[in-house]
Amino acid sequence: MKALILVGGFGTRLRPLTLSLPKPLVDFANKPMILHQIEALKAIGVDEVVLAINYEPEQLLVMSKFSNDVEATLGIKITCSQETEPLGTAGPLALARDKLVDGSGQPFFVLNSDVISDYPLEEMIAFHNAHGGEASIMVTKVDEPSKYGVVVMEEATGRVERFVEKPKLFVGNKINAGIYLLNPSVLDRIELRPTSIEKEIFPQIAEAEKLYAMLLPGFWMDIGQPRDYITGLRLYLDSLRKKSPSKLATGPHILGNVLVDETAEIGEGCLIGPNVAIGPGCVVESGVRLSHCTVMRGVHVKRYACISSSIIGWHSTVGQWARVENMSILGKNVYVCDEIYCNGGVVLHNKEIKSDILKPDIVM
C-alpha cells in the first residue's frame, strides 16, 4: 500500500523555526512532525511513502537526506516528487501518479503534513472498503464551524453532500481533517496544473455521490501556527497518557504529562509540566520551571529560569532567572541573557537577547 504526504508549504506561520528547516521537519514531541505520520503509515502496512515537495532546490536536498535516514531506520521506502511550479493540493497527486499507481487497484492515503492526530488509519481502510465509493475523507468536529469550510454529510452513511465555505448560518460542525484514502480513479479527475483537491476535486466526487466522510475519533490539530502547536502538544500528550503512559516522565518534579528524551539532563528542584516536551541533549539546571512548552534538541536552560507557553528552538540558551512566556518563539542558537523577560518575543536564529521584550515583538 502507498501514501503521499503533502509537504510543499513554506511554514511562514511557524517562523523562525521554518527558516532553516521545512515545516514537516520541525520537531513536535521530540521528533519531526512528519515522522509521526510515517510511523503511523508503516504500522498499518504502508510500504512506500511519496513526499510531495515544493520547487525550491534546498527542500529537495533536505527532504532527500531525511528520506534516506528514515528508510535506513524504519525500513520503509520513501521517495520525493518535486513540483517545478506551485501545484496546489491536487496537482502534486497528478505529478506523482506513476509513483502511486502500480496496477493493483489499491487505494492510497494522502495526508497534509501539518496535521497531528491519533491516525486511525486501519479504521479508515475498513470504512472505505465498506462504503464502496471512490474516496474517503476524515472529518473532525469543531466548536466554531464558521471559521472553516464545513463538510455537509449524511449522518447514517457518511456520504458527503456538499461543502460550505465559512458558513454564516449553521449547516454542520464537521471540517476536513486533511487525511484521505483515494481510489486510483481519483487521479483521472486531476490535471497536472495548479488545482485544489478541497475546492475542485472533492466537490466533483461528492456530486457523483462517491465521496464519503469518516468522523475522526480522538484528537486532531493542525499545528501550522504556534498557539495550535502548543495546543497540539497538550492533546498529543493526553493521548500518549492513554495509549503508552510508560513513555511519559515520572517523579516528584513532574506535574501532569511530560515527555523527556532519555539523553536530557534535569537538575534538582525543578518543576516540569504540564504539557512539556524536552528534546535530546537538553540540559535543564536546578530550580527551573517549565510548563506548556517545547524545549528542542540541545537547549540549555540555566538555574531558576521559567518558560511557559513557548517554543525554544534548537541549541538555544535561556539564562539564569530569565522568564520566557506568552507564545514566545526562539529560533535556532538564540541566547537569552540572565534575568531577561521575554513576553511574546519571536526571535530569529543566532540572536543574543540582552534587554527585556515587554510586549510581543519580532527580533530580527
Swiss-Prot record:
Q: Which residues are noted in the entry as diphosphate-binding?
A: G9, G11, T12, R13, K23
Name of the protein this chain belongs to: Probable mannose-1-phosphate guanylyltransferase 2
Q: Which CDD domains match?
A: M1P_guanylylT_B_like_N (cd06425)
Q: What is its EC number?
A: 2.7.7.13
Q: Name one GO molecular function term.
A: GTP binding
What GO CC terms are in its UniProt record?
cytoplasm
**A Gene Ontology biological process term:** GDP-mannose biosynthetic process
Pathway-wise, it operates in: Nucleotide-sugar biosynthesis; GDP-alpha-D-mannose biosynthesis; GDP-alpha-D-mannose from alpha-D-mannose 1-phosphate (GTP route): step 1/1
- Assigned protein family: Belongs to the transferase hexapeptide repeat family.
Q: Name one Pfam family in it.
A: GMPPB_C
The record's function comment reads:
Catalyzes a reaction of the Smirnoff-Wheeler pathway, the major route to ascorbate biosynthesis in plants.
Q: Which residues bind GDP-alpha-D-mannose?
A: L6, V7, G88, N112, D114, G149, N176
Q: Which UniProt keywords apply?
A: GTP-binding, Nucleotide-binding, Nucleotidyltransferase, Transferase
Please list the reactions this protein catalyses. Answer: alpha-D-mannose 1-phosphate + GTP + H(+) = GDP-alpha-D-mannose + diphosphate
